[in-house]
Amino acid sequence: MSIKNDKWIRRMAEQHKMIEPFAPHLVSRCDERSIISYGTSSYGYDVRCADEFKIFTNINSAIVDPKQFDSKSFVDVQSDVCIIPPNSFALARTIEYFRIPRDVLTICLGKSTYARCGIIVNVTPLEPEWEGHVTLEFSNTTPLPAKIYAHEGVAQLLFLQADDVCETSYKDRKGKYQGQTGVTLPRA
């Protein structure tokens, strides 16, 4: 299994629509101001966060149960920024829509800019032949409110190509998050 470089990422995005919309180079400025970078890097792709957020709240004193998740545990926010309460979390989604090839596994890592502020991003691997918007989870590990910026880089995806094609892909087994759009809550 090998990690794929910028040339491969560009080719797959342009010829196979692996990433849409796609930035072929790293973008770190917009309208003459610095932003948290997004786009193609040496061995990965830095994704952007859309302006749709679900901020966790405990106003209903609900129990968090992944098998019976109560959507009332979130407050929906549409904004260029998301303020995550102390020791809480928020869900968001990527601007980019992904179509992962059958012989590729994609791993997501947080960006150091956010990690150095105590904001951790978590995404499970994007499996072979999965497609959709990536649902992002941001944990604020600090005792202070934390800010996430929409339309800027929030995480990096690494593409690992297998030596052999898998026998059963995510699409083959009809994975429950296949083709997801928007911020997707847990499904049991």
UniProtKB/Swiss-Prot annotation:
The active site is at residue 137. It holds the Pfam family DCD. It is an enzyme of class 3 (hydrolase). The keyword Transcription does not apply. GO terms for molecular function: dCTP deaminase activity; nucleotide binding. InterPro entries: dCTP_deaminase, dUTPase-like_sf, dUTPase_trimeric. GO terms for biological process: dUMP biosynthetic process; dUTP biosynthetic process; nucleobase-containing small molecule interconversion. Pathway: Pyrimidine metabolism; dUMP biosynthesis; dUMP from dCTP (dUTP route): step 1/2. It catalyses: dCTP + H2O + H(+) = dUTP + NH4(+). The keyword Hydrolase applies. Keywords: Hydrolase, Nucleotide metabolism, Nucleotide-binding. DCTP binds at residues 111-116, 135-137, 156, 170, 180. Its EC number is 3.5.4.13. Catalyzes the deamination of dCTP to dUTP. PANTHER family: DCTP DEAMINASE (PTHR42680:SF3). Homotrimer. Belongs to the dCTP deaminase family. This is dCTP deaminase. It comes from Dichelobacter nodosus (strain VCS1703A). The gene is dcd.
